[in-house]
Amino acid sequence: MSEVFDSKSFLKTVTSQPGVYRMYDASGTVIYVGKAKDLKKRLSSYFRSNLASRKTEALVAQIHNIDVTVTHTETEALLLEHNYIKLYQPRYNVLLRDDKSYPYIFLSGDTHPRLAIHRGAKHAKGEYFGPFPNGYAVRETLALLQKIFPIRQCENSVYRNRSRPCLQYQIGRCLGPCVEGLVSEEDYAQQVEYVRLFLAGKDDQVINQLVSRMEQASQNLAFEEAARLRDQIQAVRRVTEKQFVSNNGDDLDVIGVAFESGMACLHVLFIRQGKVLGSRSYYPKVPNGTELAEVVETFVGQFYLQGSQMRTLPGEILLDFPLTTPELLAETLTEIAGRRVNVQTRPRGDRARYLKLARTNAATALTTRLSQQSTISQRLTALAQALHLPEIKRMECFDISHTMGEQTVASCVVFDANGPLRAEYRRYNITGITPGDDYAAMNQVLRRRYGKAIEESKVPDIILIDGGKGQLGQAKSVFAELDVPWDKHHPLLLGVAKGSDRKAGLETLFLEPEGEGFALPPDSPALHVIQHIRDESHNHAITGHRKKRAKVKNTSTLETIEGIGPKRRQMLLKYMGGLQPLLNASVEEIAKVPGISQALAEKIYYSLKH
């Protein structure tokens, strides 16, 4: 316990009401956030002579100050606790690493509704279906829907400015509501209603309506229409057979738990209307000495209460671990959802099988993760030994990418003890230098990255410079001139140069620009981690450069093609539905655009591709 903090005097002032407390260290940083039904009773437990765990002992030893916020109810305290955890990211709390919002399928409220992928707050008028576990699952579903129910997916800016149908209409993926006379209002509205029912899990209603229409078409001798409806029915049935899990129309989140060697995996299975939308594994950041009960309770709280306004809550949550206060979580989620949300930890029947599936997935994912972590840990230990460092907690690596000096991009990738920290990867657009001057580019990115205040925990142990002696010299000169509050002498600057034939395993490492380099054995784990972070940095830079180059190229290439003036350019973009469909189109598809000959289509195709 910190000598600076007078716990006895503090506890005399604490109320017994529900609320949230924030613990600070000597630097004023929030190190822990907690909630309590009885603040006095809970906070007193931290200052007993026999504490529950080493983690608690380490926490209490750093307490310099405690702030308390009283709430009316325990539910308010629970919500406020998770808002504070999200805000402060305290190092002694279990932290959910991935907090980005989940994607939904959005059906707009326009006169001719469109389908789109959506993340974030639900401000736009329309209907939202989901959540889906990732963007890929949404895009796959949208592609499927487009084949079965051809309603538009184009942006309103494209839709409002069309005079001819685009390629999507030509290949049967859109009914073409943008052009008058191609589809009746009733037919388009019917397809929109099918989409709405399908996404709501009411597949039987869709099939029954389609069967009824097919029979009516047959009676009217409209055999082409009947055949089209038959194909649509078969497509819907194929999809629903693949997705089917339960005939109860369940809306469930099923959470399996695995915990080993201080690492936790929580695998969430998303089931909506009896269909599996997908699943996802989460690996929360777990402070040393944390009990599994705290990991699970904190994860569940953060998962559902942080950003809850953007999440569609299920009717039921199945959990592979008993919570101490499941009623509190259920009441809080019920209040947020405006309807009953149940939390079950001992389900039976089909629900028990769902939970077993989630548990198996969690265990498998954790085993894979631990294996990867073990490899990364061994490699970092070997590198620390090779460079005579006590340990390596954080590494950063820089690379430069450009084409003949144009669209120069610098990348910075970050590794910690667990491997790549992709959320902290950064790209920097380099400007104001002589084209092709890699030294100036490196100088600029290092000044932008390190010429400011940095948290102590974010100061890297190693800064890897891809490029050898010259680039290392730039790094040394930048660091010599830095005037910053953090210890600029802490990072080890390490240059890496590829061999003459640029083969992996022939890299030369430099600690000084003027000194001799040294090489590590090709089978060295230390070399493997250097290759890993360097390749990550290179790929990150290349990807950023290509995106930047493509943006410039694609906006200007059409203007440079002989025979393509403003009118034809506008016609191409309108007819194809925008630049991206044009980039993906074949010569034959481009030649269908009015005013574009076969020869001109070939010229356009090759100009855009090369």
UniProtKB/Swiss-Prot annotation:
Belongs to the UvrC family. Transmembrane segments: none annotated. One of its GO terms (biological process) is nucleotide-excision repair. The keyword Methyltransferase does not apply. It comes from the Bacteria. One of its GO terms (molecular function) is DNA binding. Its main location: cytoplasm. Keywords: Cytoplasm, DNA damage, DNA excision, DNA repair, Excision nuclease, SOS response. The gene is uvrC. Residues 16-94 form the GIY-YIG domain. It holds the Pfam family HHH_5. PROSITE patterns: GIY_YIG, UVR, UVRC. It is found in: Cytoplasm. GO terms for cellular component: cytoplasm; excinuclease repair complex. The UvrABC repair system catalyzes the recognition and processing of DNA lesions. UvrC both incises the 5' and 3' sides of the lesion. The N-terminal half is responsible for the 3' incision and the C-terminal half is responsible for the 5' incision. Interacts with UvrB in an incision complex. The keyword DNA damage applies. Residues 204-239 form the UVR domain. Gene3D superfamilies: 5' to 3' exonuclease, C-terminal subdomain, GIY-YIG endonuclease, UVR domain, UvrC, RNAse H endonuclease domain. This is UvrABC system protein C. InterPro entries: GIY-YIG_endonuc, GIY-YIG_endonuc_sf, GIY-YIG_UvrC_Cho, Hlx-hairpin-Hlx_DNA-bd_motif, RuvA_2-like, UVR_dom, UVR_dom_sf, UvrABC_protein_C.
